[in-house]
Amino acid sequence: MTGPGPEINKEEHPSSPGKKQITYNSIPKNANLIDGSTNSSKRPIEKYDKRIADPTKSYFPHSISRTPRRKYTYILVLTSLNGTFESKHVVIPFKPDGLKLGRPVANSNSSSSSSLRGGKRVDSHTFSQVRSDNGNFDSRVLSRNHALLSCDPLTGKVYIRDLKSSNGTFINGQRIGSNDVEIKVGDVIDLGTDIDTKIEHRKISATVEELFVQPLLESPIFENEDSDDCHTITEKEEAAAITSHIYGDSNNLELEEVILGSDTEILSGIFINNCIGTSPTLSNIIKTLAMEIPFSKCDNFKLQSMENFLINYTTHLEYTNKLLVEKNDQQLVKLQNGLRRKLSGKYEKIIEQNRNQVKQLERDHMFFKKSFEVKKRRNNEKQKSMEREIEDLKTRLEVERYKNSQMMKKNKQKEQELSTASKKKTTEHDTRGVPGMNPKGTDKFSIKNTLCNHFTLLTFGTISIGIIAIVFKILSPN
């Protein structure tokens, strides 16, 4: 996206043999135009720097060496970690310049008054030198030239280095030397070491809270506006400055200096040796044309690059989409295969476990079935034996009942015989009337013996019947 360099016509002017004719029909080669597709958090630094390579120095013998005007500056915000200072917003100069950090130099000639601040007496001159926008700190453990902050104009990185201080400079607890060390947001910077608990003898401990770019775009001055309002930078102007820097807008002060040099450089080369009058209007027109021509070509180059980018984007969009679809399909196939393998292995394990469980259940079923058949056969045999015993006991019971009934009949017959015999004896006794004889006594004795015999037989029969009934009840099935 860079255009060709300035074309130098080395043919001498006919009326001025000592001058060289310069035609500004393009921008310099090393004026890098930044593409708008960058996503860097910091604003990119233009690679063109007059202090590094300025092709116009060899062609403008009357040019004045001066520091190029920049459209931005870096702001560093430091916040105290031990309450030794208030938050500072300092501007970081570009190399080879730098911002010194240290203790302010006391002015012995001025009769300054003293005041109390934070419980200690502070000289008013020293206090005036310690501000929130400079690198001075009110601490006696710091050297006057303690450390140096600087910014690289090419990379935009902020560096710090120690200036051979007595108590040292520390970054995140590591002491640094005289070489540049990059600092970033969140780093802890310690200047010096604690000597005493007093505030003036404590080290400066700070953290890099923020590091941002501040655009230096001024508002346009109108006739009906105040000067204070003209120097205020609105949010729209800051956004315009950032956009201008990212997309390489034509309002580039460095290109303007390259094109025009000093105010009268081009005009002196064109008109002075030709003895042509240089009116202010003609001078302004020529300067405007000299500025607008390369800026217009720069815009054309940017438009061409954007057109090429859009053509390439639309050309490769379909191919990129196809590649993405193929990649997604391959990834999907891989995921499906992996999932299938994982699930198949899992299901195979589950099926194998179920098969083993079924086989175990079948074995248990056969075992229980066989044991049940054995128990059933044994129970049947026991039942048959018990039935035979019951039948045997039943026959015995019938026999005993029959015997008992026969004995009862015999007992009744004997009782009847005894009763009849006793009646006969009583009648005989009454008829005989034998004195001194008591026949009733002998009859009573014989009757008692007969009753005892009958009772013994009855008891024996009852006990036999009870024993047979108990055995029958025990051996009978449920």
Curated annotation (Swiss-Prot):
Domain FHA per the UniProt entry, residue ranges: 116-176
Quaternary structure and partners: Component of a complex at least composed of FAR3, FAR7, FAR8, FAR10, FAR11 and VPS64.
Physiological role: Participates in the control of the reentry into the cell cycle following pheromone treatment.
High-level lineage: Eukaryota, Fungi, Dikarya, Ascomycota, Saccharomycotina
Membrane topology listed for this record: Single-pass type IV membrane protein
Gene Ontology biological process terms from the UniProt entry: cellular response to pheromone; re-entry into mitotic cell cycle after pheromone arrest; regulation of cell cycle
Keyword flag Nucleotide-binding: no
Cytoplasmic topological domain residue ranges: 1-454
Start and end residues of each stretch annotated as Disordered: 1-45, 101-129, 405-443
Protein name (Swiss-Prot/TrEMBL): Factor arrest protein 10
Highest taxon above the source species: Eukaryota
InterPro entries linked: Cent_Immune-Sig_Mod (IPR051176), FHA_dom (IPR000253), SMAD_FHA_dom_sf (IPR008984)
Keyword Cell cycle: yes
Gene: FAR10
GO cellular component, one term: endoplasmic reticulum membrane
Keywords per UniProt: Cell cycle, Coiled coil, Membrane, Transmembrane, Transmembrane helix
Record's compositionally biased regions (Polar residues): 22-42
SMART domains hit by this protein: FHA (SM00240)
